[in-house]
Amino acid sequence: MRNAEKKKFFAKVLLFGEYSVIFDGEAITIPLKQFSGYLDFPAHKAVSDISGKESNQKIRDLFIYLSSPEISSRFHYQINFDSLNDDLDRGMFFKSNIPRGYGAGSSGAIVAALFDQYSFENPIISESTNPKTYGLVREQLALMESYFHGSSSGLDPLSSLLGKPFKLDAQKRISFPDLPLFSGPVKRDVFLIDTGMEGDTHPLVNWFKEQIAKKAFDAELLKGLNNQVVQALLHKNELFFDGFLAQLSLFQLENMKPMIPESIRPLWQQGVNSGEWTLKLCGSGGGGFMLGFAENYHDVKSVFEVAGFTTVLPS
């Protein structure tokens, strides 16, 4: 392993852009620093705990996929597979508290860690990085993460690699905007609702693509609402932000029910009706976390707790 220190790779929250990013919608992602993971070795020669063994095997399966000529020939930055294989033989695993199936980027963090550690030409990623480099890195991360989900935008591993909020625009350009509506005297609180069940990204993405192909709902409307919310957020227009966010929430409730667990639908509808809070998908949905927005999180927290849900404030 290249680095002696155990570098952390954080979970992420995709604030906006889930599904619409598939057809060039804008996206904003932020790190979720309560959860992270890092590459590690067992204290003894063999991995002793079950989770470490499972992680080691998971990375080994990923290694087999990535090292196949069909995949590795498409890399912009070649991976040192010999070094990775040696470290796997020594029991290397990814020690993580990022919940799986929660839309928090658990597989993205693994991909980011492997890319950071084992790419021969590890590009320096910072706010001054050449835009073309961001594009190449994101493309490769998407290809690497496709092992887990069948397809990937590359946003999850890129977020974990960067460890800071960023925006992806319709031309796939990366920028690092301020998010003024989430700080200051006039603001909106963002919180996560734990549905208590795991989601499965792959079948949900397939279902979504099938609906688009059948024109079961208006994909351009979904993208338009998403982009309007993003622009209102960036321009600190709370009136437009609340309005378009409410429309986006209603669109998802009416058209994307497989992504919304039945247990949370009544609270979702209550938010649509009352305006006291607004819920939307967090990542692919189907379980895991859902995203909530409110003028004051502490005023609505008890409603979710009474209904049996745990809530989390991103940090």
What is each PLM-predicted segment?
Residues 2-16, 20-22, 29-30, 37-88, ...:
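C-terminal nucleotide
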Residues 97-109:
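Gly/Ser-rich catalytic serine loop of serine hydrolases
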Residues 105-107, 282-287:
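Glycine-rich beta-strand-to-loop/alpha-helix junction loops that act as flexible
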Residues 109-121:
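Stable alpha-helical structural segments in soluble proteins, enriched in small hydrophobic residues
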